């Protein structure tokens, strides 16, 4: 019976090989190294996809630090890559910062409708934040990237992001159902102010267009062929607890997840005596790794090392990203470090 439950390959190669994936979310508790992992995954995907976009939805915007390059809310090419792009969005931006192009039109009716639109939308809980995401999704879909990687904010924000299609669909659905009741009143208001073009269709046209996009995204998020979520954690109680909560919430939302990255692990090297602190930490991590193996036997569990230097800059991210595909070997890493030092010494 034991042979029937062989552990799955400890790498993210399954994601690279699944060409149908459009949306990949990377998330977990704060401070576990989500950004390094999401940037590394994006780098590996860029080797195998026509075009890849990584989006940071974390207000801290750490992807600029990871690649050592400033990114904005417009997709920019990552230095050293031809097909990898990055952008940073603020999940707290509301409708006041939606572009004016969203409310196109030269007449005063459209200018008034922007204010009315914001007032109505603002009255629906959660819609304001969700609509800013909706506008981003509209932009991303129009650019037609092969794969989009989301470097998400800590767990709570992430779950809100993933539920936004439902929130928007529910809220906009209510508005559109009210359209017939409000239509005569809106037309009267338009006539009163001498704006014959201001009617219910003006107000709801954009909503209907947005709702179509939202429904498509909602459908795609719940399709395991197109969307998956990679959970990142460290081998500690609180992180493992948060990961289990996240996995349960994702399952409840109908979002696929079958990969877990355990980051910042200590690895023992043959012939090297660890210090007392390292031995103690190694023992604690071993206990939680056993629990992870029991809880997630049907997941790909990737183990990443705790490094003595930061992973910063495109070249270092490229190098670290290999660990997502090939299981980390401390002996191999030590040999590579020695070779690098010798090369640096020669170049000097």
Curated annotation (Swiss-Prot):
The keyword Mitochondrion does not apply. It holds the Pfam family ArsA_ATPase. SUPFAM superfamilies: P-loop containing nucleoside triphosphate hydrolases (SSF52540). InterPro entries: Anion-transp_ATPase-like_dom, ATPase_ArsA/GET3, ATPase_ArsA/GET3_euk, P-loop_NTPase. Zn(2+) binds at residues 275, 278. It is found in: Cytoplasm; Endoplasmic reticulum. GO terms for molecular function: ATP binding; ATP hydrolysis activity; metal ion binding. CDD domains: ArsA (cd02035). One of its GO terms (cellular component) is GET complex. Its EC number is 3.6.-.-. The active site is at residue 58. One of its GO terms (biological process) is tail-anchored membrane protein insertion into ER membrane. ATP binds at residues 29-36, 236, 263. Keywords: ATP-binding, Cytoplasm, Endoplasmic reticulum, Hydrolase, Metal-binding, Nucleotide-binding, Transport, Zinc. Homodimer. PANTHER family: ARSENICAL PUMP-DRIVING ATPASE ARSENITE-TRANSLOCATING ATPASE, ATPASE GET3. HAMAP family: Asna1_Get3 (MF_03112). ATPase required for the post-translational delivery of tail-anchored (TA) proteins to the endoplasmic reticulum. Recognizes and selectively binds the transmembrane domain of TA proteins in the cytosol. This complex then targets to the endoplasmic reticulum by membrane-bound receptors, where the tail-anchored protein is released for insertion. This process is regulated by ATP binding and hydrolysis. ATP binding drives the homodimer towards the closed dimer state, facilitating recognition of newly synthesized TA membrane proteins. ATP hydrolysis is required for insertion. Belongs to the arsA ATPase family. This is ATPase ASNA1 homolog. It comes from Culex quinquefasciatus (Southern house mosquito).
